[in-house]
């Protein structure tokens, strides 16, 4: 708690308060030569309001992307700066490429495929096969994370629950992910007006 207060606490100018605080702690400890270790508490219990509608999910992901952008811009001095260790050399680069810029890469890729299809420059059977492999592989990754979490908290699932999880993972990869990629790609439109907007989620 003392370190959080000394580092400046939560920044009221951001809406991604959790990530911003963690990065701020890294920067503060590095700049002040304070030995530290930030770990993930697997047994921590916290409650959050999960969106139940697609519109609310889009608001949440838009807020997350804006919060990510704000945090990375505030701490851009650590980018590839060896003074900040692996956080600046690897973690920042990861979040820049695979989180902040990835929706733009995804949307560009989709538009490229549509254009190639329109001008008959695409091998349709190969594209379908490739997309199928992508869906199966991504669904397996999601299911692995899901079942690992189920195992660690010792929850019991029925066979129907397992089938639902498999179906939802396939839908998430093949449909929902594309929708959320568009939401994230357009999140910064009107940024000045919405940079402090939390976005209300219906209970």
Model-based region annotation:
Residues 1-85, 93, 97, 202:
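Non-transmembrane catalytic domains and loops of membrane-associated enzymes and transporters
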Residues 3, 121-122, 195-196:
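Residue-level recognition of short, well-ordered coil/turn positions
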Residues 12, 42, 136-139, 193, ...:
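Intrinsically disordered, low-complexity regions enriched in small/polar residues
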Residues 56, 60-74, 165-203:
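Membrane-proximal soluble regions of multi-pass membrane proteins
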Residues 84-87, 120:
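Membrane-helix boundary/interface segments in integral membrane proteins
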Residues 94-192:
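Membrane-embedded multi-pass helical conduit in multi-pass membrane proteins
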């Amino acid at each position: 708690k003392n370190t959080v207060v000394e580092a400046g606490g939560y920044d009221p100018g951001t809406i991604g308060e959790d990530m911003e605080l963690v990065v701020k702690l890294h920067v503060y400890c590095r700049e002040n030569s304070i030995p530290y270790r930030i770990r993930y508490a697997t047994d921590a219990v916290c409650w959050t309001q999960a969106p139940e509608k697609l519109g609310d999910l889009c608001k949440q992901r838009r807020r997350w992307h804006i919060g990510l952008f704000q945090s990375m811009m505030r701490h851009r001095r650590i980018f590839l700066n060896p003074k900040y260790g692996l956080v600046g050399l690897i973690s920042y680069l990861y979040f820049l490429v695979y989180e902040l810029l990835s929706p733009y890469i995804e949307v560009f890729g989709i538009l490229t495929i549509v254009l190639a299809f329109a001008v008959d420059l695409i091998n349709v059977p190969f594209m379908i096969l490739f997309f199928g492999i992508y869906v199966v592989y991504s669904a397996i990754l999601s299911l692995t994370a899901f079942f690992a979490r189920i195992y660690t908290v010792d929850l019991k699932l029925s066979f129907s629950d397992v089938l639902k999880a498999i179906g939802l993972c396939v839908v998430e990869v093949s449909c929902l992910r594309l929708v959320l990629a568009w939401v994230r790609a357009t999140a910064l439109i009107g940024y000045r007006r919405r940079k402090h907007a939390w976005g209300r989620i219906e209970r």
